Amino acid sequence: MLRKRDLPTIAKLDIEFDIDKIKHYIDSLDQGGWGDVYESNEGITNFANADFIRGLEYNDFKEYPCQYLRPEYWEEMKNPSLDLGKSKTEVYKNKHERTNKLSPVGNEHMWDYDMSHYRGSYIQRHITENFKAESCRTRIHWLPKGKQIQPHIDYDASYAVRIVVPISGTDNVINAFWPKNQREEYNLKADGSAYFINIGYKHAVEHNGSEDRIALLFTLKSQEDVENYAIRKET
């Protein structure tokens, strides 16, 4: 099992998307479906750092969900179990490594219910046909110009793998990472490229451009698609 230290900070994959088809899909959506981080991620925000979530709301960050929590867990969404342990270390481990103590609401693997507008779409078909691993929590990000996604850590690559496909508004956008506490900066191009991003490291997005940034994000439940990018052998 590969962990964050075994993988690069960012890797451009050998899979490309048709940006025009994604833009057409986004244009076809009910624009009322965009929601703030709380509306689009009901329940799962309980398992993230509260200050970070408030920061997303402050920066007018929005998402359009394509995959949602499985219907059998919708009732638990109202009052998910937050018992993650007694010590700070235990709570951190259960949050960032997504152990089996986590409620299904907080488990991204359970966010694989395809919404009606997503079923049969170009994005769904392209992911299914080109990636070996199953996907979950597919969504569209919208970060307004001049705003930021504050530094944060999501989870280790041993739990799941994050993929991002920039769609538009990437000029003067910095994707910052801090592996080994050293800042690294990247600019991801909106040219159809798909990138693995190592969200086990602290990372942020700083938007200094003049156009809102829109990106496709999804999670892979396993590591088959990034194993060839490992910088060190499994331990």
Label each residue range with its predicted role:
Residues 1-127:
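Non-heme Fe(II)/2-oxoglutarate
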Residues 13, 22, 138-140, 197, ...:
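Generic structural hydrophobic/aromatic packing signal, biased to beta-strands
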Residues 8-12, 148, 160-162, 215:
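Intrinsic-disorder/low-complexity, polar/charged segments enriched in Ser/Thr/Lys/Arg/Asp/Glu/Gln
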Residues 12-17, 167, 218-220:
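Short beta-strand-to-loop capping motifs
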Residues 169-235:
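Catalytic core of Fe(II)/2-oxoglutarate
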Residues 122-195:
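Catalytic core of non-heme Fe(II) oxygenases with the double-stranded beta-helix
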